[in-house]
């Protein structure tokens, strides 16, 4: 549709959906999403942060005349969602009742099916005729997440149930992040992806940012030239040497042209976005700890690291001046059975269609033991190993209670963050709660942690915009309207383009009054800069695949050359043994 057509559609849909005294108007992208939903019967919305997904979520039930609508949101956004509904129902004809569940609760054992007791799952018990997935990227983990398994089983069993899924970050690095969600939203004849798993896996290997599984890396995307729909696609394919990028662009056009798929293709926010790297130097004591970490893969308390992911995580913590210590340290007699059992559970969930939680795997193994005791079934070697694994874990499980405490080596990074916060109103973003708690206790800053609340239970939205605050990335990094601030300092940049897009969108969004939004991130070790590089690679992939403008690519990057390099152990590679 042209811009004028979209404006006409917004006026028309507003008149049909507003209350007699309503004064709000649908945005063109909201009107288009609701129109596609009504026409196709489902919606796959790749809608940028701040596009108005909440209103679409509520009006979806009105448009489809749903009798039993269900809205699924992250737990931290429940209160905000209820508040928004009270405001929006003054202007639009929202459903009188819309059941709200959270991804967190839906993934718990209580929400699952219990065949022994004849208990239905939470989804089957409510039996919604419409499921709205807000922040739908929470349902992307196809193989392992219990909530995804339960949603998948529900849609297979209830073919007439409709689905509207929306997110500004629908994918992270793979087509597999959203392929299953597409099948819930659209009828089979409209799907822009293969429905056969093996063929979809080949597409994934050709298109994905990173592909690692079964020893197979990315494959040549040449076969996807068949996706070229017109002369423009063909010219793009012929002009570029980067066939993988061309395949992503061609796929993106195929995706966004599919009926029922709506994607924002522009970012009309007036404020510019500037991303800066802030180099932070630490004490000689931290460098000494880093030297030991790099050389021996060992924390100061003697705890050894097993893989590169652990090194990446602990190095980023240490570069902020602390490390996490088991207090007390778990005995090997407890740790090894726990490790073995968790490895077995992960393997079982990955290959099972019926089991979707650790407790269900435990019950399944318990049933094996019962069959063996009554001689109803002879156990094979694999079954016996499962029983032995569980027995070994249950024998020691309650003998130790895990507990970690932060050990501080240096507070230079925190002092710099506090000085920054006291010189301008802004948000200091932290990943680990202990960092936020110390900034609160030692430097006098308000810290909004779990559920976006401070120690007095005040919501982050109610904080004085003239004062700085510290916010948890996990609790407030998505779904919050924080455009009252335009300055950001991130102490621990997420190494994910999807998470960073959400984080940038808290302050760089509609309603921002400042001319510029500044987002600084701390670089005090090599891993901090690697997180930035990975996020950049992710955002290029996301924009190429979905066409949704990514803030990281629209921003001005004031990142000095060499900011991620230096002398000393904080900048060594993990296999280096000398300076």
Where are these regions (language model features)?
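A conserved SF2-helicase RecA2
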Residues: 495-504, 508-579
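Walker A/P-loop NTP-binding motif
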Residues: 35-41, 53-67, 185
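SF2 helicase motor core recognition
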Residues: 47, 52-54, 108-110, 119-121, ...
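Conserved Helicase C-terminal RecA-like lobe
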Residues: 3-9, 24, 38-39, 56, ...
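Conserved pre-motif I regulatory segment
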Residues: 2-44
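Conserved Walker A/P-loop ATP-binding site and its immediately adjacent core
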Residues: 54-59, 65-88, 174-177, 431-434
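Inter-lobe coupling linker of SF2 helicases/translocases
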Residues: 100-107, 118-127, 140-168, 173, ...
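Conserved helix-turn-beta segment of the N-terminal RecA-like "Helicase ATP-binding" lobe
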Residues: 76-98, 185-188
